[in-house]
Curated annotation (Swiss-Prot):
This is Iron-sulfur flavoprotein MJ1083. InterPro entries: Flavoprotein-like_sf, FMN_Rdtase-like_dom, ISF_SsuE-like. It comes from Methanocaldococcus jannaschii (strain ATCC 43067 / DSM 2661 / JAL-1 / JCM 10045 / NBRC 100440) (Methanococcus jannaschii). Belongs to the SsuE family. Isf subfamily. One of its GO terms (molecular function) is oxidoreductase activity. Redox-active protein probably involved in electron transport.
Length: 193
C-alpha cells in the first residue's frame, strides 16, 4: 500500500508542504508507505488543448508531469495540497490537474482514495473552495473522496499561514491534516483488504 502527497505550492518549504507532510506522517504511522512530491521544483507546462492524449493516451509535452502521473497511477491514495489562490488551487497544481487527462482515459485513478489540503492567509480564506476544487478533480477521475477524520471531520486539512512556517503554530490546521492522513489510511486499508 502506498499514498503519495503532492504539494502544489510554488514554495518548496511553505505551509502547504508542511501540512501535506503532516498528513503523510499520520499515514506512515499506520504502516503505509508514503512519498512526498513538491511541484515547486518541477518543470510543469500547461495543457495546450491538442487532444493528442485522447488519440495516443499520452501527453506529447515533455516535462515532469508524465513521471508524476505515473506515480499517481501506481498509488493507492493521493493527497493533493494547495495554497489558496483567489479561492482555488495554485497554477502549479492546476497544470498537473489539467494534464492528468491521459489518466482519465479508462479511469485509471478509479477507486483510489483522495484527500485534500489547503492553506489560506486567514481562517476563512478560501480553504474550503480550494478543497472543493480538488474534490471535484478526484470525483471526475472516479476516485473515492475523503475528508479529515473525527473529531474534526470536515473537508480535509485546512491551514492558516501567510509566511512560510506559520502553520507550525496552527494547531487546528495541523490537527485537520493529521486527521485527513488517518482517514486516507483507514479507507486505503479497507479497500486493500
Amino acid at each position: 500500500m502506498k499514498v503519495i502527497g503532492i504539494s502544489g505550492s510554488p514554495r518548496p518549504e511553505g505551509n502547504t508542504t508542511l501540512l501535506v507532510r503532516e498528513a503523510l506522517n499520520a499515514i506512515a504511522e499506520e504502516g503505509i508507505e508514503t512519498e512526498f512530491i513538491s511541484l515547486a521544483d518541477k518543470e510543469l507546462n500547461p495543457c495546450i488543448g491538442c487532444n493528442m492524449c485522447k488519440e495516443e493516451g499520452k501527453c506529447p509535452i515533455i516535462d515532469d508531469v508524465d513521471e508524476i502521473l505515473k506515480k499517481m497511477k501506481e498509488a493507492d491514495g493521493i493527497i493533493l495540497g494547495s495554497p489558496v489562490y483567489f479561492g482555488g488551487v495554485s497554477a502549479q497544481l492546476k497544470m498537473l490537474m489539467d494534464r492528468s487527462r491521459p489518466l482519465r482515459i479508462g479511469f485509471q485513478l478509479r477507486n483510489k482514495v483522495g484527500g485534500a489540503v489547503a492553506v489560506g492567509a486567514s481562517r476563512n480564506g478560501g480553504q474550503e473552495t480550494t478543497i472543493q476544487q480538488i474534490h471535484n478533480f478526484f470525483l471526475i477521475h472516479s476516485m473515492i473522496v475523503v475528508g479529515d477524520n473525527d473529531p474534526t471531520a470536515h473537508y480535509g486539512g485546512t491551514g492558516v499561514g501567510k509566511a512560510p512556517g506559520d502553520c507550525k503554530n496552527d494547531d487546528i490546521g495541523l490537527e485537520t491534516a493529521r486527521n485527513l492522513g488517518k482517514k486516507v489510511a483507514e479507507v486505503v486499508k479497507l479497500i486493500k483488504k
